[in-house]
C-alpha cells in the first residue's frame, strides 16, 4: 500500500480507570509479551448484500475465492464475537442484537508457526437508523445510459463502501416545481437546470435499487429557488427576496446562458412559499419513493430584503422553513447544508434535522477548520448529531485522476476527528459543487484504498464517532535514529500528529502522517500532496494513568483494517511498544 502508516488507531483498555481520571498510575507495572503475529495476503474480495443491517437481520456474505482451511471471524473493535470455518463462496451470519455497532469480518488462515494471514476483510454496520452513523453518497446523472444493470453496478460499489444514504443532485425539473410532470401524469423524460435529459424511470430505478441495499434516498433542492417561468406555475412576486428595499432587483444565482434559467431566490420564511413548495414535495413523495429532503442554501448573501422592504435574516428563516417541511412530512428525513457554516447553529437548533452537513470552502480550508466545525456542531446538536463534510477535492486540477495521497489524508483526518466525507458517487468521485462534473477519475488503486477506508470507518465507528472525550497524550519515539517529530493536534508539516480520545474506558490514539505533507489544507487544490514517508517498526512510549490490559492497532493501510494486538511493557507511568 502506497499510503501505509498514515492513519493508526491504538487503543489502551484500562481495567481500573473507566472514567479516564486515573490516580497518577506511576506504580503500575506489567505488560504482555505473547501476541499473535499478523501478516496479510489480500487475495479474497468480500461483499455483503446491504450497506447496513438491523439487529438480528441476516447478513449474506460472498467471497470471490476462498483457499482451503480459511476461517471467517467476526470482531467488534478487537473482541472476537464468533468464528466459523467457511466452505463455498457464500454464507450468512446473524447480526447481533446490540444496535448501533460496527463489526469487521475477516477471512484468515493460520501458518504452522501460528502467524495469522489476513486474506480479506469487510465491515458490517448493525444500526437500525442510518443517521446515527451517516455515510453519505450521491447520484447526479439520470439519462438513457442509466440502465437497470448500470445502476445495479454503480450501487454495488456504493454498497461495498457501506454508503447508507444517497443524495440525488440535479434530478429535478425546476427548483420551484421539482417533479418532472404533474402529480397525476409524470413525464417520461424532462430537462434539468442544465438542460440535460432526466429519465423518470432512471430516478425510480436508482431509488428502488438503493432500497434493496438498505440505503436511504434523499432528494436535493434549494429551500428558496425559482426559475424565470415561476409566475406561470403559481409563484408570487411577494415571495421573493431582493437586493434593495424597492422590490425591483430580485436576488439571483446566475447560470450559463445554455442552461434553463438563472435561479431567483425566495424568502424561505414566507409562509405561502413554504406551503407551495411543501405541496410540490408532496407531489414528489406521492410518485417517487424518496426518504427525505436534502435542503440547500447559498451561504451569506449580504443584506437582502423581502417584498415589503424588511431586511431578511436568512438563518432565522431556515429555522422556519425546516419546521414547515417537517410539519408537512413528519415521517420524512431532513438534512440542510450549512455553506461555510452559515446558519449552522440555527439549523442544528431546530431539532428537526437528522445530521449536520457542512459544505466547506476556501474560508475553511485547513485541517484545523474541520476540527473547529466538528467541535461547534457537537455543541449545536447537543452532542447528538453527526457531521458530514461536503468537501470538494483537487478543486483546481483540470483533468486526469484524483491525487490519492491528498484524498486519503483528508479522509484519514475527517474520520479520526469523528466526521465523514460526502465524496462517492455511483459513477464518479466528487470534484466540484456541480455534482455531475466528471473531470477527474478514480484510479483502481484509489478505489481499492477507498473501500479499505470506508471499511475502517464503519468497523470502528464506535471509537471514531460515538462519543468520548478528547484528551492530550504524551507520545514519543524512543529511537532517535528514526528522526521522527511527533506532535499533538493540531497538525504540523514534517511530523506525525496524534489525536486522542477516551471512549468507554479505552484510550484511542490516532497517528496521522504529515511527514511529507506540502500543505496543512484538506483541499489539495492542484492534486500535489505527496505520498507520505512510510514509517515501520516505530518504538513508542505513551504516558498512561492506570493499569493497561491490552494494546492493539488497526489502520486501513495495512491488513485491510484488521486489528493486531501489540506486545507492551508498563512501568513508571508509561507503556512502551513498537508500532509495526
Residue ranges and their predicted role:
Residues 4-41:
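Bacterial Sec-dependent N-terminal signal peptides
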Residues 119-174:
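An acidic-aromatic substrate-binding cleft motif
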Residues 128-148, 219-288:
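Active-site-adjacent "subsite" loops/lids of carbohydrate-active enzymes
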Residues 172-203, 231-268, 299-316:
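Aromatic- and acidic-residue-enriched carbohydrate-binding clefts of CAZyme catalytic domains
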Residues 268-356, 361-375, 381-384:
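Active-site neighborhood of glycoside hydrolase catalytic domains
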Residues 297, 382-471, 515:
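Aromatic/acidic polysaccharide-binding cleft in carbohydrate-active enzymes
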Residues 482-545:
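Carbohydrate-binding surface patches
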Residues 569-580:
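C-terminal beta-strand-rich structural cap/linker in extracellular carbohydrate-active enzymes
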Amino acid at each position: 500500500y502506497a499510503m501505509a502508516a498514515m492513519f493508526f488507531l491504538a487503543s489502551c483498555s484500562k481495567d481500573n480507570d473507566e472514567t479516564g481520571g486515573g490516580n497518577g498510575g506511576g506504580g503500575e507495572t506489567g505488560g504482555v509479551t505473547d501476541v499473535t503475529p499478523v501478516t496479510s495476503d489480500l487475495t479474497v474480495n468480500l461483499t455483503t448484500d446491504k450497506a447496513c443491517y438491523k439487529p438480528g437481520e441476516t447478513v449474506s456474505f460472498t467471497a470471490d475465492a476462498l483457499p482451503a482451511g480459511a476461517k471467517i471471524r467476526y470482531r467488534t473493535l478487537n473482541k472476537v464475537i464468533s468464528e466459523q470455518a467457511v466452505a463455498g463462496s457464500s454464507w450468512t451470519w446473524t447480526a447481533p442484537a446490540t444496535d448501533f455497532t460496527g463489526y469487521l469480518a475477516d477471512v484468515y488462515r493460520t501458518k504452522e508457526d501460528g502467524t495469522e494471514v489476513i486474506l480479506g476483510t469487510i465491515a458490517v454496520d448493525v444500526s437500525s437508523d442510518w443517521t446515527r452513523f451517516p455515510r453519505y453518497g450521491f447520484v447526479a446523472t439520470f439519462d438513457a445510459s442509466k440502465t437497470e444493470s448500470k445502476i445495479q453496478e454503480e450501487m454495488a460499489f456504493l454498497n461495498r463502501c457501506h454508503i447508507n444514504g444517497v443524495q440525488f443532485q440535479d434530478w429535478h425539473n425546476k427548483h420551484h416545481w421539482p417533479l418532472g410532470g404533474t402529480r397525476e401524469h409524470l413525464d417520461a423524460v424532462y430537462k434539468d437546470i442544465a438542460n440535460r435529459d432526466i429519465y423518470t424511470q432512471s430516478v425510480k430505478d436508482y431509488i428502488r435499487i438503493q432500497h434493496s441495499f438498505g440505503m436511504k434516498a434523499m432528494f436535493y433542492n434549494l429551500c428558496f429557488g425559482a426559475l424565470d417561468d415561476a409566475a406561470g406555475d403559481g409563484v408570487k412576486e411577494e415571495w421573493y427576496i431582493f437586493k434593495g428595499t424597492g422590490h425591483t432587483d430580485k436576488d439571483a444565482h446566475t447560470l450559463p446562458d445554455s442552461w434553463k434559467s438563472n435561479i431567483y431566490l425566495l424568502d424561505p420564511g414566507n409562509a405561502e412559499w413554504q406551503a407551495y413548495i411543501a405541496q410540490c414535495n408532496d407531489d414528489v413523495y406521492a410518485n417517487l419513493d424518496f426518504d427525505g429532503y436534502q435542503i440547500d442554501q447559498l451561504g451569506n448573501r449580504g443584506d437582502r430584503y423581502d417584498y415589503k422592504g424588511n431586511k431578511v435574516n436568512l438563518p432565522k428563516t431556515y429555522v422556519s422553513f425546516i419546521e414547515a417541511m417537517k410539519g408537512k412530512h413528519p415521517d420524512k428525513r431532513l438534512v440542510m447544508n450549512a455553506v461555510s457554516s452559515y446558519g449552522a447553529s440555527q439549523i442544528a437548533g431546530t431539532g428537526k434535522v437528522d445530521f449536520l452537513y457542512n459544505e466547506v470552502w476556501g474560508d475553511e480550508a485547513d485541517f484545523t477548520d474541520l476540527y473547529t466545525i466538528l467541535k461547534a456542531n457537537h455543541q449545536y446538536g447537543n452532542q447528538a448529531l453527526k457531521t458530514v463534510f461536503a468537501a470538494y477535492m483537487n478543486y483546481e486540477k483540470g483533468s486526469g485522476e484524483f491525487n490519492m495521497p491528498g484524498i486519503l489524508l483528508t479522509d484519514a483526518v475527517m474520520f479520526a476527528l469523528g466526521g465523514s466525507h460526502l465524496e462517492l458517487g455511483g459513477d464518479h468521485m466528487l470534484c466540484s459543487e456541480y455534482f455531475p462534473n466528471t473531470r477527474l477519475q478514480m484510479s483502481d488503486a484509489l478505489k481499492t484504498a477507498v473501500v479499505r477506508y470506508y471499511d475502517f470507518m464503519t468497523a470502528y465507528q464506535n471509537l471514531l464517532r460515538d462519543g468520548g472525550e478528547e484528551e492530550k497524550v504524551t507520545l514519543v519515539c524512543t529511537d532517535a535514529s528514526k528522526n521522527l517529530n511527533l506532535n499533538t493536534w493540531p497538525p504540523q508539516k514534517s511530523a506525525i500528529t496524534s489525536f486522542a480520545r477516551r471512549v468507554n474506558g479505552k484510550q484511542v490514539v490516532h497517528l496521522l502522517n504529515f511527514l511529507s505533507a506540502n500543505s496543512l489544507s484538506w483541499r489539495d487544490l492542484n492534486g500535489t500532496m505527496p505520498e507520505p514517508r512510510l514509517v515501520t517498526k516505530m518504538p513508542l512510549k505513551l504516558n498512561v494513568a492506570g493499569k493497561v490490559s491490552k494494546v492493539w492497532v488497526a489502520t486501513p493501510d495495512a491488513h485491510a483494517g484488521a486489528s493486531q494486538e501489540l506486545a507492551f511493557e508498563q512501568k513508571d507511568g508509561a507503556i512502551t511498544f513498537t508500532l509495526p
